Structures are given as structure tokens and as C-alpha cells.
Curated annotation (Swiss-Prot):
It catalyses: 2 L-arginine + 3 NADPH + 4 O2 + H(+) = 2 L-citrulline + 2 nitric oxide + 3 NADP(+) + 4 H2O. This is Nitric oxide synthase-like protein. The lineage of its organism: Eukaryota, Metazoa, Ecdysozoa, Arthropoda, Hexapoda. Keywords: Calmodulin-binding, FAD, Flavoprotein, FMN, Heme, Iron, Metal-binding, NADP, Oxidoreductase. Binds 1 FAD. Residues 420-615 form the Flavodoxin-like domain.
Length: 1097
């Protein structure tokens, strides 16, 4: 490519299109979407824009990609190994010089970062016709003035004499010292320039001292810590940005050799040598070399003393060689200008001196352009003939004097340009609730955006400034359904990065990757990986600035993760931990340790503590220290965001949706309506617990595989709803369709506008129906809800008690676990509380679907769906409290033939049958854990009947229950044994009279040798379905079987279990606690405590 010109003439549309086509090809290739419909659609849009306007607008992600790539292509930069770590401030919306000045002050503050320099670029509007350019007239944002003296000498920096003269003619009145910071001279939209003095507190200056020469400080040398180039043209995709400022950090020789010792700069070399006692009359004694070394020693020493980032020329050279190797491997070349790359000192003993380099030019790029004062078309009298009036300078200088940079004026301006992306994945809606709360908190100081992982464009992740992840874990370590794709995409990025960009083997990782991750993650704790922290990693460093240890696709992303889960499960918060680890492995910088929120204990308090802490760290990381803004955010944390004045029920202006449509919108699921065909109890009349069989007929075709789940939408019990309705106010007719509305505030050019907006999820529905079908009134209220209830109490003692529960985590958890109260029970406990129905509806969580394993086969039970459901009832308060009824199990038990039930299918790909019928199966499922296995044996029978010649492998079923009266599907199992569909059936009884107490894992241990043979020699698949405690006991027992009969060490056993999961031969379908007897509840709390302790770093 030809040497780039100065770019003084605007480009014609044809040239713009040629460059745009090339750039878009690079961009879409970088996100692995080259030649896709998205690429073609974007190219079409660009062509249309150019045809209409002669130019086009880059998207934000294209701009960020281009800015980083231009640094990567910069042939004269030795520090390009850091090219992906560039913070881009998109200021294309700025149209005034005062706006430009504000943005550049923000840039200086962010990049200086109290000495921990961060690379950044600020970009202003692009060139259009060449007559409305935006320009920064300074060659660097920070530089020292140079005053020509009558005797021909220069006071200050001789390099800037011409520009200093220009500033003086514009009206600048400096103190005229050797270290005056030049004002910023800015022009917007082709208009004449204005100048602005940079607040001195923004400029970090390093006063030079020497580690051994005390006299060095008497020279009063100093230099600014931030090298921010501001006079170059950014050329990207045919678009030219004539006004931009970008910075890295200093290499010591730039100051020590060039700025201090060049003869046309400060030229202090001879003075230094004389102070050293060297003879400066002859070059033979190498006095220049000796003095030059000591000046550079002083520069490095001084920066280190001030904890300011700098890199020495040896380290920089070595990092460039590494970068060169990387680029040759990844891009088959690296443009490099040898003359500029080789340091001005000790050249031949650096590796770059001996490195052959090829100089060629790539786009996007940063190019030189003529100084603005040489090309500007003045609209008023030229400054060389007289002073022009200063229109805005004095006004803005008044503002700068009136408020410090840490004020709202500057702090909030910076915050609007720093994006904080909050991602969530959820099954129950809790993570979504927390994510939105986090969005509100961060919205006080950042441009906060909240997305579900399933809706997030993964190609944007490399360009995020701040990423906050809030995610739950489904089952025993799996991602929520709307987080699966995100996790897989992260795996794909990591795989591509490890294999190499040009690898043709790159493909989407399968969901079984999560199974392996679930195993690997057990060996991971939040404290294991090195915590990358910009606040500490580069301070005073001469080597870390070019370290490549933390490089990766996400090396410019700062992140923090809050993981939700239940410590009743062994793989506590597994998916959140997995995402946290993946982000680190991809080069992301964790600004806060992973935090976990336990459903069993103090989840709300853990979230609020983490949210407050991560907000403070994020503000510190991005230099947002506006005290008022921080206080506003802290006030928002842990308080009721809504009030009785901002929520209301109103008559709707349109007809209510059908119940089916309303449920689909509320839960964002596609439901199928089913008719109940049969509902029968599976146990004998003497059985102490009820388990029912439900036969459903879908009203439309559904597709599923054995092992999948259904999500059932249940109703709250009528007596609970009636009790609640009797205690609420602000609604007269509970059966009138109403719309829940929230008062929204919008900032417009006309001021603050308030309007009532419909709730985003709750439909137009009667209040009775909302509390029956849409809102969760059985889960113990959150501390936020208790805080609101306290405000509605007329009795002061009740108000005091509720406030204690809302603010004391220990008291809340003890109360919650002992009473486990429904909302009506809470209102009974505090009878003077009278909440508003509207605010109560807004604060309550949605009533979530309950999941059940499918007990049928699509081959054996066409157009039918079977469920096996344990009916849950229990007493709270150690068995002495009121009877509680499981919401969904009792709802299903009460359904009669002909009743309608709404459900949806949730795929469980990790619990499907192997395709090969000859593969042996080991099935372990006590109680309702037998549910999916009934579908399995019916499915196997249907397959065997249709493929008579196929050899089928053995199927062993281990079932457990309390007594023989609870032996579910006993007759079906006996028939399957007779037909050879089941090979062996084992029964474990834990409460049968005159029979030794046994559990399924103990029965399995008794035939451990055979199980070992099936797994090792026959390739059997091992399935476990049941509660989390049983599943963990089975897992541990299987490890013991393998160790004993395989004569393995503990490490070999661990590796074997990892292998089973990696090969997708160990399958778990695990659910939480369904029985809340005192015995079970006490055991679950103790198990949860152990799992929490085990998961801590």
C-alpha cells in the first residue's frame, strides 16, 4: 500500500466505499461472521448511506474494533502488544468546543488514574465535506509551553514555541514559567478555535530525583505522566476522524533521551555531566553516554517513586519481539518502521536492533495531518493580525474555577460515556430481579444496560468496558436455560483463542462441555486465579505494563460475577463460578472477587453487600468519585425503589388478554394447554405419603424426548388468596380487570416528564386472578417486602419487629427457617399491617412454573404426557406449626378429568438415552426419582419392538422407598422384567418393619463388582434421579465402588469420574428439598452449611 497522505482533501464516495468494504470484511471476520446475511445486510446499509450522504456512520462496536486495530497497525509504535487494551470514548455526539474540552478532561482523568496509566482514545465527529472539521490543535493534550527570549534562548520546551505564540495571540495569559501547561485549543464544526486552560489538578507531574545523586532534584526537572497524542487523523473504513486523542504510557527513553537531552529540546545533558564531574571537553571519555544513562535512571526512579506507569526500553523491546512473533503467527506479518521502533539508547543491545522489519501500511490507521493552524479557514480576523474576541473561554473558565473536576459537572459527564453491561441468566426470575436492581444502582454513575444472556449479542463482549454478571445455577451445576448459549459462546471464544484464529477446527462446543465443567469447577475456587486489578497491577511498574500473561480476547473487559444457588446442592453456584473462571481465562480483569448468594441463607443480604462493594470498586476503577452521585446510588441500595405514590391499579383502556396469552407474556414461555385424562394415587391407601400419576392430553402437538421436563403453571390455594385479599387496600372490586401501572420519569428537552406506564410483565387482569395465578404468595417475603410492610403497620411494636427482620440477617434467617411463612401468615402475625394491593403486586416475585420429569415415551404414549408427582404437605415450626401445601403438587392432585393444565417442555439433553440400544444402563431413582425411568423403559420397549434384530444392552434399575406400600409402578416393573426390557430391579426399603433399613446407594454397593464391570468394560451409562442429598451419596458410593473394584488411587478415581462426565455417561437429574419435616429440614440446613464452607476459597 502506498504511503498515506496528509488527508487534507475529503474523500470521494467511491474511495469511501472501497475502504468501507475492506474494513467491514475485517470486522465481520473478527467476529466469525464473514459473508453471513448480517455482513451482507450491513454492507447494503453502508452503500445506501454513502449513496445518499457521501459518507456513513460506524456502529459503536465497529468504531471500537477499528480504534484497536489501528493501534495494532501502527508501524511506529513499540508498545503494540497492548493493542487490545484500549478504552474507547465515543464522543461523536459532541458538537461544541466546551463539550470537547469536557470530554478531554474526562480522558485525562481516566487515563492518568492516579499514576496507574490506562490506554484510551477519545473520538469526536468525523469529517464530512472538509469545511466542518473538528480539530484538537495541540500535538499532545498535555505539553509545556516554550517562550522565545530576547537573547535567543527559550524558556520552557522549544518544541512548542510556535504553538505557544498562537495561544498567546488567542488571548492566553500564562505565568511564563518553564513549566506552564499549554491550554487546549479546540475547534468544532469548522468554526474558529477556543482555548481552555486544563485544571492543574488533572495533570500528574513527576518531579525528577536520582537514587544516588542528591543534587539531581535541584535541577527542578519534571515531566507529565500522560503522553496523549492529539494531532493525528484516525482513518477507519473510509471515514476520517480529524479530532481524536489517544494515549498509552511512556517508555523511559522518550523522556530521558528525547525530551530532556535532545539538543533541540531541554538539552540538559551537558549540565548533568558537569554535575557528575565529567570532562565535557572531549567525547572520547563517553561523557554523553554516561550522563544519558543517569538521566534515564532518574526518570525510571522518579516514576516508580510516584507509583506512575512507565516501561524501560529493554522490556519494551522484548515485548515488541513477542508481539512480532504473535503477529507473524496470526496475521503472517507485522508492519514495523525500524527507525522508530529501535530505542534511542543502547540500541544494539536490544533485540529489536537485530530484527529485520517490513514497513508497509494497513488500515484502519492513525495518520499525520497538517497542523490545524496551517489549514484552518478563519471566519474572523486572523490571530497574527490582531486578537480575536474570545466568546466561550471566559464563561467556561469560570465554571472550571467554580467547581473542581471531581464535581458533578465532570464526574457525571464521564459516567455517561462509560458503559456498564449487566447480564443475567435465570430460572425463577431472581437473577433478573437482582440484575435490574444492579442496573438502577449503576445507572447513577454509568450508562447501565441490562440484558438477558439469551438476548445478548456475544460479539459485543470484547468491547465492553464493564461487565457485571448475575446468574443462577439450574439443578446440580447446569446453566439456566437462557444462559446455555452464552456459556457455550464463551467456550467457543476460549477454544478459538487457544487453538488460534486461523484454526479450521473451531466449532460450537456441545452442552456436555458443562458437565465436564461441573467436575472441573469443583477444583476451582474464586481465590485460585490471580486477581487482575488495574488499581494495583501497573503502579510503579517498569515491566508489568508490557506483560502478556493476562492477554486474551477479553483483556480490555473488567468484570464481576454474582452467582446465585442453593447450598443444598453439592455443586453450589456452579454456573456462576464457571462463567467467572471463563472470563478470567479469556483475559478479563476481575475487579471484585466472585460472590455467592445462597437461597438457603441470606441471599438478599449477600447480594446487597456485593452490589455496594462492586459499585464502589467500579467507581474507583473508572475514576468516578462524585460524592453526590455515590451517595445517591448507596441510598438506592437496600431500599424500596417503588412507593405507594409511584404504583397504582387503573382501569385498562383495552380488553384483557386471554389467560393463555397473559401467561405466555408474563413468563416469556410458549405454553401448551392440556386436558387431564386421569389422576390416580400410585400408593396403597395405607401409604403415609401420596404420589400421584397424571395422564395429560395436549391440545396441540408437542415434541419431547424421554428424560425431558415439563414446566407446570399452577395456582395459589383459594384460601390463601382470600386471606390475602381481606388484608389489602386501594382496590374496591377484586374481580374487575385492572392494569398495574408504574410512574416513570423521563428527561426531555422540555424538562422532566412523568407518565404512568403499564407493568412490563403483569397483564390486565383482576386482582384476584393476579394473586391466584401470577404472583408468588407462598414463599417467605424478602427483606425488601418486610421493610414495606413495616411502613404500613399501625402498631409500633409490630413495626419495630418487622424492621428488625428486615435489617438483621441473623434474625431474618432464623425466623424464615422456623416459620417458613406464606405472605398471608406474615399478615396474620402482624395484624396491623395493611399494604396496598398495587405496591404489593409490584414487589412480589412472579409465580414460577414447577418442573417435573416426564414419565412417558413419545413412541409408547402418542399424544399423551405422563407425570409422576409426590404430593407435598408439611408442618412448619418443627412440626408444630400450620400445614403447608406444595403449590404445584397439590394443584395437580386436585385436578379432575377434563380440567385444563398449562405447561411447556424443558429439554434436558444431558439426561437423554444413548442412541445405541446395546449400551447398558444403570438407573438409580428412589421415590419419584423413578419418574423419568418409567419413560425410559417404555421407550426402550417401543424401540425393541420396532427393531427386533437389534441387540439390547442390560438395564439395571435401583429403586428405593420407605415401605412396600410405596413401591411405585411395581406391576409395570414386574412386566418389564418378564419382557426383558428391564434386566434387574433392586428395591431398597428404609422404613419397612422387620426389614433392615437400606438405601439405594447401599444396594448398589452390594453389587459393586458388577457395576464396575458394566462401566469399565461395557461402556454403561449411569443415571441418577432424585434429591440432591441422595445424588451426592450415590456419587460418593460410586467412587468407592470404582476405587475398590478397580484398585485405583484417589486421583485415578477422580480422573475416572471426570472421564465419565466428559463422555456424557454420568447423568444427573436432581431436584431440591420437597419435604420440610423437622428431620429433613434440619439435615438440609446442615448439608447446606457444609456445601457453603466447601465452596469458599
Amino acid at each position: 500500500m502506498a504511503i498515506p497522505g496528509r488527508g487534507d482533501v475529503p474523500r470521494d464516495p467511491e474511495e469511501v466505499l472501497n475502504d468501507a468494504k475492506d474494513f467491514l470484511g475485517q470486522y465481520f471476520a473478527s467476529i466469525r461472521r464473514a459473508n453471513t446475511p448480517a455482513h451482507e445486510a450491513r454492507w447494503k446499509i453502508v452503500q445506501e448511506e454513502v449513496a445518499t450522504t457521501g459518507t456513513y456512520q460506524l456502529t459503536t462496536t465497529e468504531l471500537v474494533f477499528g480504534a484497536k486495530l489501528a493501534w495494532r497497525n501502527a508501524s511506529r509504535c513499540i508498545g503494540r502488544i497492548q493493542w487490545s487494551k484500549l478504552q474507547v470514548f465515543d464522543c461523536r455526539q459532541v458538537t461544541t468546543t466546551s463539550g470537547m474540552f469536557e470530554a478531554l478532561c474526562n480522558h485525562i482523568k481516566y487515563s492518568t488514574n492516579k499514576g496507574n496509566i490506562r490506554s484510551a482514545i477519545t473520538l469526536f465527529p468525523q469529517r464530512t465535506d472538509g469545511k466542518h472539521d473538528y480539530r484538537i490543535w495541540n500535538s499532545q493534550l498535555i505539553s509545556y509551553a516554550g517562550y522565545r527570549q530576547p537573547d535567543g534562548t527559550v524558556l520552557g520546551d522549544p518544541m512548542h514555541c510556535e504553538f505557544t505564540d498562537l495561544c498567546l495571540k488567542l488571548g492566553w495569559k500564562p505565568p511564563r514559567t518553564a513549566w506552564d501547561i499549554l491550554p487546549l485549543v479546540l475547534s468544532a464544526n469548522g468554526k474558529d478555535p477556543d482555548y481552555f486552560e486544563i485544571p492543574r489538578e488533572l495533570v500528574m507531574e513527576i518531579h525528577m530525583t536520582h537514587p544516588t545523586f542528591e543534587w539531581f532534584k535541584e535541577l527542578e526537572l519534571r515531566w507529565y505522566a500522560l503522553p496523549a497524542v492529539s494531532s493525528m487523523r484516525f482513518d477507519c473504513g473510509g471515514i476520517e476522524f480529524t479530532a481524536n486523542a489517544f494515549n498509552g504510557w511512556y517508555m523511559s527513553t522518550e523522556i530521558g533521551c528525547r525530551n530532556f537531552c535532545d539538543t533541540n529540546r531541554l538539552n540538559v545533558l551537558e549540565k548533568i555531566a558537569q554535575n557528575m564531574g565529567l570532562d565535557t571537553r572531549t567525547p572520547v571519555n563517553l561523557w554523553k553516554d554516561k550522563a544519558l544513562v543517569e538521566v534515564n535512571v532518574a526518570v525510571l526512579h522518579s516514576f516508580q517513586q510516584h507509583n506512575a506507569t512507565i516501561v524501560d526500553h529493554h522490556t519494551a523491546s522484548e515485548s515488541f519481539i513477542k508481539h512480532l512473533d504473535n503477529e507473524n503467527r496470526l496475521r503472517s506479518g507485522c508492519p514495523a518502521d525500524w527507525i522508530w521502533i529501535v530505542p534511542p539508547m543502547s540500541s544494539s543491545i536490544t533485540p529489536v536492533f537485530h530484527q529485520e522489519m517490513a514497513l508497509y501500511y494497513l488500515k484502519p490507521s492513525y495518520e499525520y495531518q497538517e497542523p490545524a493552524w496551517k489549514t484552518h479557514q478563519w471566519q474572523k480576523s486572523k490571530p497574527i493580525t490582531g486578537k480575536r474576541p474570545i466568546n466561550r473561554k471566559f464563561h467556561f473558565k469560570q465554571i472550571a474555577r467554580a467547581v473542581k473536576f471531581t464535581s458533578k459537572l465532570f464526574g457525571r459527564a464521564l459516567s455517561k460515556r462509560i458503559k456498564a453491561t449487566v447480564l443475567y441468566a435465570t430460572e425463577t426470575g431472581k437473577s433478573e430481579q437482582y440484575a435490574k436492581e444492579l442496573g438502577v444502582i449503576f445507572g447513577h454513575a454509568f450508562n447501565a444496560q441490562v440484558h438477558c444472556m439469551a438476548d445478548y449479542d456475544i460479539t459485543s463482549i470484547e468491547h465492553e468496558a464493564l461487565l457485571l454478571v448475575v446468574t443462577s445455577t439450574f439443578g446440580n451445576g447446569d446453566p439456566p436455560e437462557n444462559g446455555v448459549a452464552f456459556g457455550e459462546h464463551l467456550c467457543e471464544i476460549l477454544y478459538a483463542d487457544q487453538v488460534g484464529e486461523d484454526s479450521t477446527g473451531n466449532q460450537m462446543l456441545t452442552p456436555k462441555s458443562f458437565i465436564k465443567a461441573n467436575s472441573d469447577i469443583q477444583r476451582y475456587t474464586a481465590g485460585n486465579p490471580k486477581k487482575l486489578n488495574r488499581l494495583e497491577s501497573l503502579k510503579g511498574s517498569t515491566t508489568d505494563a508490557t506483560s502478556i500473561d493476562s492477554f486474551g480476547p477479553l483483556s480490555n473487559v473488567r468484570f464481576a460475577v454474582f452467582a446465585l444457588g442453593s447450598s443444598a446442592y453439592p455443586n453450589f453456584c456452579n454456573f456462576g463460578k464457571y462463567v467467572d473462571k471463563l472470563l478470567v481465562d479469556l483475559g478479563g480483569e476481575r475487579i471484585h472477587d466472585l460472590a455467592t448468594g445462597d437461597e438457603m441463607c441470606g441471599q438478599d443480604q449477600a447480594f446487597r453487600k456485593w452490589a455496594s462493594s462492586v459499585f464502589n470498586v467500579a467507581c474507583e476503577t473508572f475514576c468516578l468519585d462524585d460524592d453526590e452521585t455515590l451517595q445517591e446510588a448507596k441510598r438506592a441500595l437496600g431500599t424500596v425503589a417503588l412507593s405507594e405514590e409511584t404504583v397504582q391499579f387503573a382501569r385498562a383502556g383495552c380488553r384483557p388478554a386471554t389467560l393463555h396469552a397473559a401467561l405466555q407474556k408474563s413468563l416469556n414461555k410458549q405454553f401448551v394447554s392440556c386436558t387431564v385424562k386421569a389422576n390416580k394415587d400410585l400408593g396403597d391407601a395405607s401409604a403415609e405419603r401420596s404420589t400421584i400419576f397424571i395422564d395429560l392430553e395436549p391440545k396441540e402437538e408437542i415434541k419431547y424426548n424421554p428424560g425431558d421436563h415439563v414446566g407446570i403453571i399452577a395456582c395459589n390455594r383459594k384460601e390463601l388468596v382470600e386471606s390475602l385479599l381481606s388484608r389489602i387496600k386501594d382496590v374496591d372490586d377484586y374481580d374487575e380487570p385492572l392494569q398495574l401501572q408504574l410512574l416513570k420519569e423521563t428527561h426531555t428537552s422540555s424538562g422532566l416528564v412523568k407518565s404512568w406506564e403499564p407493568h412490563e410483565k403483569l397483564p390486565i387482569m383482576s386482582v384476584r386472578e393476579l394473586f391466584t395465578r401470577f404472583l408468588d404468595i407462598t414463599t417467605p417475603p424478602t427483606t425488601i417486602l418486610l421493610q414495606y410492610l413495616a411502613t404500613t403497620c399501625e402498631d409500633e411494636e409490630e413495626k419495630k419487629q418487622l424492621n428488625v427482620l428486615a435489617t438483621d440477617p441473623g434474625a431474618y434467617e432464623d425466623w424464615r427457617h422456623f416459620h417458613f411463612p406464606t405472605l398471608p401468615e406474615v399478615l396474620d402475625q402482624f395484624p396491623s399491617a395493611r399494604p396496598n394491593a398495587s405496591l404489593l403486586a409490584a414487589l412480589l416475585s412472579p409465580l414460577q412454573p414447577r418442573f417435573y420429569s416426564i414419565s412417558s415415551s413419545p413412541l409408547a404414549h402418542a399424544k399423551r404426557l405422563h407425570l409422576t408427582v409426590a404430593v407435598v404437605t408439611y408442618r412448619t415450626q418443627d412440626g408444630e406449626g400450620p400445614v403447608h401445601y406444595g403449590v404445584c403438587s397439590n394443584y395437580l392432585m386436585e385436578r379432575k378429568p377434563g380440567d385444563e393444565v398449562y405447561l411447556f417442555i424443558r429439554s434436558a439433553p444431558n439426561f437423554h438415552l444413548p442412541q445405541d440400544l446395546s449400551v447398558p444402563l444403570i438407573l438409580i431413582g428412589p421415590g419419584t426419582g423413578i419418574a423419568p425411568f418409567r419413560g425410559f423403559w417404555h421407550h426402550r420397549r417401543a424401540l425393541q419392538n420396532s427393531c427386533s434384530r437389534t441387540t439390547t444392552g442390560p438395564v439395571w434399575l435401583f429403586f428405593g422407598c420407605r415401605t412396600k406400600t410405596m413401591d411405585l409402578y411395581r406391576e409395570e416393573k414386574e412386566q418389564a422384567l418378564k419382557e426383558g426390557v428391564l434386566s434387574k430391579v433392586f428395591l431398597a426399603l428404609s422404613r419397612e418393619k422387620e426389614v433392615p433399613k437400606t438405601y439405594v446407594q447401599e444396594v448398589a454397593e452390594n453389587v459393586g463388582a458388577e457395576i464396575h464391570d458394566l462401566l469399565i468394560n461395557k461402556g454403561a451409562h449411569f443415571y441418577v434421579c432424585g434429591d440432591c442429598k441422595m445424588a451426592e451419596d450415590v456419587h460418593q458410593k460410586l467412587k468407592g465402588i470404582v476405587k475398590k473394584h478397580g484398585n485405583m488411587t484417589d486421583e485415578q478415581v477422580q480422573n475416572f469420574m471426570f472421564m465419565l462426565k466428559e463422555e456424557n455417561r454420568y447423568h444427573e437429574d436432581i431436584f431440591g428439598i420437597t419435604l420440610r419435616t423437622a428431620e429433613v429440614h434440619s439435615a438440609s440446613r446442615e448439608s447446606a452449611r457444609r456445601n457453603r464452607v466447601a465452596s469458599q476459597p
